[in-house]
Amino acid sequence: MTDLSQHTPMMQQYFKLKHQHPDQLMFYRMGDFYELFYEDAKKAAKLLDITLTARGQSGGKAIPMAGIPFHSAEGYLAKLVKLGESVAICEQIGDPATSKGPVERQVVRIITPGTVSDEALLDERRDNLLAAILGDERLFGLAVLDITSGRFSVQEIKGWETLLAELERLNPAELLIPDDWPQGLPSEKRRGVRRRAPWDFDRDSAHKSLCQQFGTQDLKGFGCQNLTLAIGAAGCLLAYAKETQRTALPHLRSLRHDRLDDTVILDGASRRNLELDINLSGGRENTLQSVVDRCQTAMASRLMSRWLNRPLRDRAVLEARQESIACLLERYRFENLQPQLKEIGDLERILARIGLRNARPRDLARLRDALAALPDLQNAMTELEAPHLQALATTIGTYPELAELLAKAIIDNPPAVIRDGGVIKTGYDAELDELQALSENAGQFLMDLEAREKARTGLPNLKVGYNRIHGYFIELPRVQAEQAPADYIRRQTLKGAERFITPELKAFEDKALSAQSRALAREKALYEELLERLIGHLAPLQDSASALAELDVLANLAERALNLDLNRPRFVEHTCLHIEQGRHPVVEQVLETPFVANDLALDADTRMLVITGPNMGGKSTYMRQTALIVLLAHIGSFVPAARCELSLVDRIFTRIGSSDDLAGGRSTFMVEMSETANILHNATDKSLVLMDEVGRGTSTFDGLSLAWAAAEDLARTRAFTLFATHYFELTVLPESQPAVANVHLNATEHNERIVFLHHVLPGPASQSYGLAVAQLAGVPAPVIQRAREHLKRLETTSLPHEMPSQQSGKPASPMQSDLFASLPHPVIDELSRINPDDISPRQALDLLYAWKMRV
């Protein structure tokens, strides 16, 4: 620590506080500014684009400093939090008038990316999560806390790949890991990683603190008593939250045990490729959520995002949601509910801020309005007969006493903060009313005093006024100042005037200013009492908020089903995926022409479709729409199809698109193969797999070989697979793999221009139309002509693989050249190595039968 003896008393105070918070920027309150000093000032000046100055000296050197106005701090804090910085807020808690030496200060709150709760610093439509992990390469405990809602969950996960996929799903703003973990682990590549002391993860201490937080003897009731690694991580989260918030956390009431087995697992690549809530450019436009989310409240939008990113495998829950949506669609009942739900607002985060004791007056006004809307909403729900909706209605209370309390206590349109008062209604508290009357009557007193003094002194330019620095005063022009009566005491000299005070005015000033400060203190005390009373009702209010958010999502899905022509899917026990007239929900919305719907049929007999056809023909759209239909079914939503029948899936994999990983030192092909390896290792017979153009990132023979082998492996796994390819050789797979079938996206050429028809038809494509697509893209005509010459030569020098004709009696169109045609057949290769004199007649017959099966 710096030698403090060489520094001024104020800087000594600063260094003592800064020493306790070395990793955070310190906002040090000085009057109407937050000041930053030394390295904090340099860093903040760079990040916030504010002026770096050097004022005064301490320890014999100029002090680098930067400041931001107290009243506009929120905007600067929001920017720092988005940049991943943490800030310690150091306030003046002493009275400057009575302080000897520097005003007493202390850190009242630490704002970090994962524990921020201020409305202005949060994205209202995204969860803001704090996570912690503990474990080794084989087993990890993961704890996740949303301090803005009170959701607190734990789970144990096997293996790095699964852990990283879960972290990608959650996308925590901050991630806590033990300080004794080795450097360079995969988790450290994430943003917002903070290393914490190993003892912060101690399991025994964690168990004790969690039981104390929830008021229980053990954690058995939460189903996580034996999750020792996850409990250690949860204990670290709880301690970190308390350390940063500097208050109790009454809104953290329980711990949920999440299980991966209950969900449809999507890895990071699949989540990105399907563009669930973030598009490939990092924005939110043209994502699945942008189409299916018309929720009335922000808390419902966040719930919708959680549903989309964590589809369920619990058929009972999914069918209960479907039944609820169907009920809300009857007689358009959702239309009555949605305007009332809009009045509820973001109840979830308002209640969290009340629990954290940093709720603002407008939070209480919004809570008042939400509680006032609940009785009408309850009445509207009485006609909903779906069991799940009835359960939600039972959970949603009305709280008439709290509604009345807030209606009496808070003015209609309160100010943003309690700091200057003006929040509590007249008539709520007699003592406050009396003090405010005394303060507010000052204006009339001053007018009367001014009239009397003008009459007494005969000075018509005399004025009586007030300012915050010098208090009350009588002002005379400089030329009349000499005529002031003897009882006028000089208070302030201005350029053209003199200000005075009289004993009468001084007595009034003492009384009025005392009343003003006492009124403000009383109002703040009443506000704190209100928060405490509300905290006593947090548990049922939070349960109501959760039920209201789910009701909002279900009403939204009913509205979307009506306006997007979505239909109810049917889950079945036997393995199948049948879709009639399926559509891509996002592409359909952006097309100016009608979307071409297509069917899909996978079942016990057909597990894989090899999809061929031209680029831009719709292969990727067809594959993605299948995955999105399956995913929507697994959140309980209706789906964009005329009819859908499916069994539950355990995972959705996608290997679509190509991009390199420059930061990780991986080429496009390496990324492609890594994703392919993950699929081949983890796909099961209950998985849905989308494979698009596997092998295109390397040489033709290597790529074709890899694609062929991968397709064979998936066929043996019996995963539901859509395998799009330009390797026409793969269309012979059905001959050796009975569960594989061919389909193609059709197109035609007209006047040497390609026309995409987008229909999915049985059988392989007749040609790829690659040159036509190149021409459409604007490749120069001489290049296209030269390519035609090369293509003609290649087609005549390579033997095409014999394929069945397209229609009975008509020869097939010329196929793409079989690049394997020039390779020796494996049977021929084996035959060339056999010496007939070395084998018996029986061995020769066995070989003959084996070769017969393979040819």
Curated annotation (Swiss-Prot):
Q: Which SMART domains match?
A: MUTSac, MUTSd
Region described as Disordered: 796-816
Q: Name one GO biological process term.
A: mismatch repair
- A Pfam family found in this protein is MutS_II
Superkingdom: Bacteria
A GO term for molecular function = mismatched DNA binding
Q: What are the annotated GO cellular component locations?
A: cytosol
**Annotated protein name in UniProt:** DNA mismatch repair protein MutS
The protein's organism comes out as Pseudomonas aeruginosa (strain LESB58)
